Amino acid sequence: MPKISKILLLAVSVVLVVAVFLGVNSNGVSAATEPQDGAYRQINVYSEVLRHIQTDYVEQPNITAVTNGALRGLLESLDADSSYLTPEDYKAYKADKGGKAQVGINVSKRYGYASVVSVVPGSPADKADISDGDIIEAIGPADTRDISLAMIQLLLEGQPGTELTLSVVRPRKSAPDKIVLTRVAPTLPPVTETLYENSSILYLKPGVLDRDHVQQIEMKLKGMSKAGNKKILLDLRDVAAGDMTEATRLANFFLKDGTIAMLEGQKVEKQTFTADASKAINTTAPVVVLVNRGTAGPAELVAAALLDNKRADLVGEKTFGEGAQQKTFELPDGAALILSIAKYESPSGKKLQDEGVTPGVLVASNVDQASAVDEDATPTETQAAPAKPSVTVDEQLSKALALLKNKAA
């Protein structure tokens, strides 16, 4: 469909949606007594556009297809996590029981197309050198610009052994790469543990902040004294998946008091999550947290809590900026809205969704941190001694270690 048709018909669908949101009846009379933010005045403009389309446009467009696209755009203009699902999409969405094979990509739709937030280490996507910041232009024949985030996530899943083709736009390349990936059953490695400085620095890197991985971190923190560990380096780079409840629990391991996070929405009463001294494990050991642009959601909550409570130094890059609570609203025609109804805030009141977390020590990424090597590392049971490949030294890791070395335990 010509671009002008899409633009004009966007206005048509907005008329209908605004009318629904604001309570306008079939005669154009508002159920409310006062206009809200001038929205009612805009309805007259949209109606005029509709009149011109009906009387002057060159051809009869497919109203259903364009309206669906306009509704997707309306939801996506709110934030990257909100989605509109057509009746067909929502039926497929409800039928998805989870646990399917995946390719190891955490995605967002902040920039129109699907963008890679982070990649699971060792996954098919990781082995294909897909990295955070890459743009997924298409999944098979489906242009990601024209489908919702929920459906993009659904298309990335499938049965083990099945293939999918991604069209990936990479920085500094003019043409997209066609990459074929084979879906595999999701497997997450245990928390990586490495020791530095004669075991005085305990390095921990989870791949996800779920119950199992947070429990692994808990056990390692509890064993620090026995192992002779005196300082902690928590690597949350490219950690984008997990659970906010588990993230709150992880932050509490390092805090005996203070606010961990807050959650608030237009119709969601403000909740404040406070540290419980009985659940704290180590509140005195020096801590440095590594973050980058692939740090999102639960990992951002942890980073913000430790930063604002002055419990840790943050090193790396500004994080992605994701932290909203969603709710699904079913519509009469079988369609649905996935709408952000509340946003998480840091202890200082910054919305994670809008602002992300900015480290006190900014260090640009110069290497794929999953393959970085530090010659001072001491292998542990959970990490075999690596070979010494020719890779660039991880400057973010080096800076974090330097900070910890200079801190008194």
Walk through the language-model features, giving the residues of each.
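Terminal targeting/pro-maturation regions of precursor/exported proteins
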Residues: 2-82, 109-110, 114, 229, ...
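A residue-level signal for conserved active-site and pocket-lining positions in enzyme catalytic cores
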Residues: 49, 105, 400
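Cleft-lining beta-strand/loop regions that shape enzyme active-site pockets
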Residues: 31-42, 48-58, 62-63, 115-118, ...
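PDZ/PDZ-like peptide-tail recognition elements
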Residues: 69, 77-118
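Short capping micro-motif at the N-terminus of alpha-helices
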Residues: 146, 179, 263, 339, ...
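Conserved functional hotspot residues or short segments at active or partner-binding sites
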Residues: 336, 343, 347-409
